């Protein structure tokens, strides 16, 4: 994400009337990094007031914002997350207002302090093990491959998959080819844990050298642990193959399952 401006200053958007009173006096910036389909704003600069984030979704994206609110409520018992300040749902829109976790994303920290890469990866691995150790029986959300494949197929059939955003290994592939090659990697035995669903460097927040929380939890649910490992491994590839290798070592996997890894990377292309 280093090639784009991460946010852009903007004017206050038109808001649901129930939010108006709380948000006067803030400066506004629109996020350019998130790929959820929702519009995300950072609210800052109001004297004696906390920094906030506001996420807005319309249509089907409103359902995604609602999913995130529900998962934030549940996961906060186990992991450090933003706090919900306000949630509004109408037939067409959803608004989710949360506190901001102070600090910088793991991506930003790796860019600014490349010599700290090993320490950063170690912290990521420990945090991920903590998430994956939450008892599956406590999780009410399903995100297994059957569920995700159904979502992926629906997105493909409705023309919602952006082939121009595929990883370099699949650059120029039609969506149908990714679908076909992905299915060649099935079946495999699932190793189900509670997953984040989009465990990328931009969704993990560091402050003063410590990993203090995660954001964008709308895909949290029970799935194979490689759902998270694959996405994080892929992100680390932007920095160094040695960091990719270290991730598995510190997580506790001596021999990574490359079949599962590739399956989940292909699956992620549909979202």
UniProtKB/Swiss-Prot annotation:
**InterPro entries this protein is in?**
AGP_Transferase, Aminoglycoside_PTrfase, Kan/Strep_kinase, Kinase-like_dom_sf
Keywords recorded for this protein, A-Z: Antibiotic resistance, ATP-binding, Kinase, Nucleotide-binding, Plasmid, Transferase, Transposable element
The molecular function terms in GO held by this entry are: ATP binding; kanamycin kinase activity
Q: Which residues form the active site?
A: 198
What is known to happen upon mutating residue 247 to F?
Answer: In plasmid Rts1
Catalyses which reaction(s): kanamycin A + ATP = kanamycin 3'-phosphate + ADP + H(+)
Q: Which domain of life is it from?
A: Bacteria
Look up keyword Membrane and say if it applies.
Answer: no
EC assignment: the record states 2.7.1.95
**UniProt keyword annotation of Chloroplast present:** no
Q: What CDD domains has UniProt attached to this entry?
A: APH (cd05150)
Q: Which Pfam families match?
A: APH
GO BP annotations of the record are: response to antibiotic
Please, what other remarks does the record include?
A: This enzyme is encoded by the kanamycin resistance transposon Tn903.
Family in the record: Belongs to the aminoglycoside phosphotransferase family.
Task performed by this protein: Resistance to kanamycin and structurally-related aminoglycosides, including amikacin.
Query: What is the name of the protein in this document?
Result: Aminoglycoside 3'-phosphotransferase
Q: What is the lineage of its organism?
A: Bacteria, Pseudomonadati, Pseudomonadota, Gammaproteobacteria, Enterobacterales
